[in-house]
């Protein structure tokens, strides 16, 4: 049994991981799904099956004053990218106390936060790191400035137009083109999830957690590569139809980060092909590791 800590993407909720959670639990693993937008955090509520009950009684989780103190101090995750990363790191350490080092999995914005957490907390106890369609930071200062301007414009649009109008536009972006082929039931659920958040909350997350605050891509790749050299399985996952993040995957692969490109899917691999993604995440733990490359 291994624990998995899962971080959702922009305008998502923990429910976005439901299909993957079911697959991992069926294989005997424990799952902790963090609501990145929640201002308060009770670790017991993160467990999708109450996995911490035994830990509180006998494994000393409550006695980990350092991790608990860090979690308490990071209760306003929207203060900054550093604040949400500190919170993720504290949760990872508490889960490690309860269940052993977990696999940290992040999608898109959640993947950026996972990667930045590794940059800022090099001593994090991890059994694996899976980054799905995640930006790894600006290439240079010009890119950082452009990202800051873009995220600021998006935040302003949210505040001026509201969530519904913003999402009408958001869903037309080429990044989400493949999601238009999903069933109407799934698309309705995605839209409801996106509209569950307030415009101000989403705007603040763009301003506080945007890619313009990340370490440069070279620094992120260095930290992720260092993790792999320490024997921690690391994997970057992208959909073949997502040209932007398939290119990020290629740059990661060029410096030795293992990559899996999943065919016939776009940006959100775990939504468009949950069984494939669940198998990839679980495969990080397999003896000999996952099979790198494009899946047939």
Predicted regions and their residues:
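Gly/Ala-rich beta-loop-alpha elbow adjacent to hydrolase catalytic centers
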Residues: 106, 110, 114
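Flexible "cap/lid" loop of the alpha/beta hydrolase fold
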Residues: 129-158
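Active-site glycine-rich loops that stabilize anionic/oxyanionic intermediates
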Residues: 9-12, 108
